[in-house]
């Protein structure tokens, strides 16, 4: 593998080797990242990247689409089966583009969109002012209860009835608790709004039956196909409404995209098949068990877990008790081979570029085969680094850094990722 690349472009080849080593010998704890199977990557790197296929199966604007039509049909059917829905569009290039298409299929620019505040656990595309969603729509943002740090459904209802949004968005990128979609739908119906659920972060948990299926209540469900779903980087739109499905299709193409990425759609089909296996269900159970163990261990060491714990694959850690910023923590951990991301916390006092917390997720380390025992070790390593941060650049004493680096590498070597699967 990569032999042709090595000959043609040794610079890119060498950079790929560097990234392979980072993934192989580092602890990946970014909640939105995971490791795709070799089968998924083979589909991604296939000859399908050569094929243009504007339009939809049996209704293309290019010839020669016999085989890609079958591939897209297969991906759509598998998505429908996996998430128990009537309709699926597998063409969105990303979760953000899936959200854009979803919004524009049921609303017009200038309409009111209500979503969760980014600093409370939402996502850029849920109405952040710097994002298209905040520029195209009039945005109302809800948050979490300041005491429980969980969604305040009474506040959501009150705001929805007051502002009468066209769209209510549920879902988030840093919210660790199970969301009550039934309650959201009741609020949406009362306010005369469409309910869009962005399940990008927890789609794998939904597929495994370990998280409520939002398709039972939402007018539209959007998702990415990576993260907990463990597929290629891409987007997905689901619905049970025939008219909405027609509008979604028109909004994806030609509304917001041109040709679909057929190599990515093939990889999506592979990942949907993988997600229908019994092994995938066991994997997702372990993802949650690992997250709960890691959160409990960090809490026992004196760190504060936002909302007091997690129901899912991720947790938000408040670093205020250690007087360390998220920025410094991210840098310090990365120096030791542990990757997380700085993250704002509810009622944040710092800028998003500094932040008071870090977001941690367990999908990637669980993919490697790690379990509760390893989570306890990882918690020890994280705490050892965080309690020794010296400055805002994330510097820590050299001997601490060396010891943690060695421990991280040793742990990763016990759970090999790609070295035994990819021939370099």
Swiss-Prot record:
It catalyses: (6R)-5,10-methylene-5,6,7,8-tetrahydrofolate + glycine + H2O = (6S)-5,6,7,8-tetrahydrofolate + L-serine. GO terms for molecular function: glycine hydroxymethyltransferase activity; pyridoxal phosphate binding. GO terms for biological process: glycine biosynthetic process from serine; tetrahydrofolate interconversion. Its cofactor is pyridoxal 5'-phosphate. It comes from the Bacteria. CDD domains: SHMT. Its EC number is 2.1.2.1. Keywords: Amino-acid biosynthesis, Cytoplasm, One-carbon metabolism, Pyridoxal phosphate, Transferase. PROSITE patterns: SHMT. (6S)-5,6,7,8-tetrahydrofolate binds at residues 118, 122-124, 351-353. Pfam families: SHMT (PF00464). Pathway: One-carbon metabolism; tetrahydrofolate interconversion; Amino-acid biosynthesis; glycine biosynthesis; glycine from L-serine: step 1/1. Its main location: cytoplasm. The keyword Amino-acid biosynthesis applies. It is found in: Cytoplasm. The modification N6-(pyridoxal phosphate)lysine is found at residue 227. InterPro entries: PyrdxlP-dep_Trfase (IPR015424), PyrdxlP-dep_Trfase_major (IPR015421), PyrdxlP-dep_Trfase_small (IPR015422), Ser_HO-MeTrfase (IPR001085), Ser_HO-MeTrfase-like (IPR049943), Ser_HO-MeTrfase_PLP_BS (IPR019798), SHMT-like_dom (IPR039429). One of its GO terms (cellular component) is cytosol. It is an enzyme of class 2 (transferase). The record marks 226 as: Plays an important role in substrate specificity. Catalyzes the reversible interconversion of serine and glycine with tetrahydrofolate (THF) serving as the one-carbon carrier. This reaction serves as the major source of one-carbon groups required for the biosynthesis of purines, thymidylate, methionine, and other important biomolecules. Also exhibits THF-independent aldolase activity toward beta-hydroxyamino acids, producing glycine and aldehydes, via a retro-aldol mechanism. NCBIfam families: PRK00011.1. Homodimer. Belongs to the SHMT family. This is Serine hydroxymethyltransferase. It comes from Pseudothermotoga lettingae (strain ATCC BAA-301 / DSM 14385 / NBRC 107922 / TMO) (Thermotoga lettingae). The lineage of its organism: Bacteria, Thermotogati, Thermotogota, Thermotogae, Thermotogales.
């Amino acid at each position: 593998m990569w032999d042709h690349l090595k000959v043609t472009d040794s610079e890119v080849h060498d950079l790929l080797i560097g990234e392979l080593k980072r993934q192989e010998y580092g602890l990946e704890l970014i909640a939105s990242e995971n490791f795709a199977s070799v089968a998924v990557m083979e589909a991604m790197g296939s000859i399908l990247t050569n094929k243009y296929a504007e339009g939809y199966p049996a209704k293309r604007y290019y010839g020669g689409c016999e085989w890609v039509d079958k591939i897209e049909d297969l991906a759509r059917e598998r998505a429908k089966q996996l998430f128990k829905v009537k309709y699926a569009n597998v063409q969105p290039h990303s979760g953000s583009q899936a959200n854009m298409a979803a919004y524009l299929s049921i609303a017009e620019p200038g309409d009111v969109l209500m979503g969760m505040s980014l600093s409370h656990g939402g996502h850029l595309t849920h109405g952040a002012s710097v994002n298209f969603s905040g520029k195209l729509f009039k945005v109302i943002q809800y948050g979490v209860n300041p005491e429980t740090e969980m969604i305040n459904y009474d506040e959501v209802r009150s705001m929805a009835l007051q502002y009468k949004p066209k769209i209510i968005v549920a879902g988030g990128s840093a919210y660790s608790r199970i969301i009550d979609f039934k309650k959201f739908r009741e609020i949406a119906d009362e306010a005369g709004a469409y309910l869009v659920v962005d399940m990008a972060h927890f789609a794998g948990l939904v597929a495994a039956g370990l998280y409520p299926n939002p398709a039972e209540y939402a007018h539209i469900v959007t998702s990415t196909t990576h993260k907990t779903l463990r597929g290629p980087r891409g987007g997905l739109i689901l619905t049970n409404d025939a008219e909405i499905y027609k509008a979604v299709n028109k909004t994806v193409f030609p509304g917001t995209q041109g040709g679909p990425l057929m190599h990515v759609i093939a990889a999506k089909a592979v990942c949907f098949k993988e997600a229908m296996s019994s092994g995938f269900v066991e994997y997702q159970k372990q993802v949650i068990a690992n997250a709960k163990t890691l959160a409990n261990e960090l809490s026992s060491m004196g760190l504060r877990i936002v909302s007091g714990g997690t129901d899912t694959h991720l947790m938000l850690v408040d670093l205020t008790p250690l007087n360390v910023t998220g920025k410094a923590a991210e840098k310090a951990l990365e120096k030791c081979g542990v990757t997380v991301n700085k993250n704002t916390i509810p009622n944040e006092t710092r800028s998003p570029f500094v932040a008071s917390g870090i977001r941690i997720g367990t999908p990637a380390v669980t993919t490697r085969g790690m379990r509760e025992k390893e989570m306890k070790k990882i918690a020890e390593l994280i705490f050892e680094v965080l309690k020794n941060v010296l400055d805002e650049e994330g510097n820590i004493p050299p001997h601490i850094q060396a010891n943690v680096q060695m421990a991280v590498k040793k742990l990763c070597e016990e759970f090999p990722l790609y070295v035994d699967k990819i021939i370099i």
